[in-house]
Amino acid sequence: MQVFWFIPTHGDSRYLGTSEGAREVGIDYLKQVAVAADTLGYEGVLIPTGRSCEDPWVVASALAAVTQKLRFLVAVRPGLMTPTLAARMAATFDRISGGRLLVNLVTGGDVAELEGDGLFLDHAARYEASSEFIRIWRDVLAASHDSGEISFKGRHLRVKGARVLYPPLQRPHPPVYFGGSSAAAHELAGEQVDTYLTWGEPPADVALKLADVRKHAERHGRTVKFGIRLHVIVRETEAAAWAAADDLISRLDDETVARAQAVFAKMDSEGQRRMAALHAGGSKRTREALEISPNLWAGVGLVRGGAGTALVGDPHQVAARIREYSELGIDTFVLSGYPHLEEAYRFAELVFPLLPLAVRNKLPGQVLSGPFGEVMATGIVPRASQS
């Protein structure tokens, strides 16, 4: 099992939908979050993409220099960059980071944003272009290890003699991640990507999506790994966790929710439609209505686009829900919490010891170079309580 954290390049706060409790998200703060994730033992971080965010490649390049083992899941955008240029960017980042790049293929579903960026393709055409894009990207990087070149002619993209002179460290290319809920997305995932990502829906719904992607992958003679994107609100007691969830949306008003939902309703995204359905387009507002599955809360999606659900509970409850998703075949968990710096520590301290993680976890055990609390009486090292 791998656990990733999130770099909040679109802002961070203690409350959703208000500037109250917000903090300045400059490079110094982003470095704090990245170094915390690296030190705590998170496998990697997702850096978001889109006009509401800082550029992910620039941010990732800055953060790679201040981290040691942390991997970076960074977006490539079909239609907004050429596949060969994106391949060169990926190869360079992989080389200068010591092989720490993961690539997130993002087709996009916000029509207004896409048109503002110069992309005027409908849903079907965007996925066709994405398929051609990632095929060229993968092939030109694979060829780069032998100083080769490729040519390709498709409906949307064409390259002739494409080359990447400096190959990535990872062979044949950095792993490709991809998320999408439409039939076209599942077909693309089964045919070309390494890890399929889903947003946090109830386990039964997630199981159906994974089964469909597996079916497409089998048809192409492939296997695909799976990941899930979730927020987390974990506290030492269940009551405290639900109080924190209520507090997160306590500054929301009807107008703010309605404005956000109006934007989401215009998107050409099956995944966003499914997220909105979980809270009935913003009409569900009570804890009972927003808890759509045990410990799975849809409150974040009232005003946040994309991943809109959170696991809420005490450490054992949250770990149990994670194991439930793991039993479906998910081995990568991309998590976040508000504010992202504090919650990176909280989740690692409370939940990491309960999960079957790789050796990156530095929290268990008692070593003087690790976390042991404040030394008492000039020489007494604190130990874990026996209660």
Swiss-Prot record:
Under the heading CDD domains, the entry gives: Alkanesulfonate_monoxygenase
Q: Does the keyword Flavoprotein apply?
A: yes
Catalyzed reaction equations? an alkanesulfonate + FMNH2 + O2 = an aldehyde + FMN + sulfite + H2O + 2 H(+)
Q: Which GO terms describe its biological process?
A: alkanesulfonate catabolic process
Q: Where are the transmembrane segments?
A: none
Q: Which Pfam families match?
A: Bac_luciferase
Say which domain of life the source belongs to.
Bacteria
Q: Which GO terms describe its molecular function?
A: alkanesulfonate monooxygenase activity
EC number in record: 1.14.14.5
**What's in the keyword line of the UniProt record?**
Flavoprotein, FMN, Monooxygenase, Oxidoreductase
PANTHER family registered for this protein in UniProt: ALKANESULFONATE MONOOXYGENASE, ALKANESULFONATE MONOOXYGENASE-RELATED
Q: What's this protein's family per the entry?
A: Belongs to the SsuD family.
Q: Which NCBIfam families does the record associate with it?
A: alk_sulf_monoox (TIGR03565), PRK00719.1 (NF001939)
Function of the protein: Catalyzes the desulfonation of aliphatic sulfonates.
Protein's UniProt name: Alkanesulfonate monooxygenase
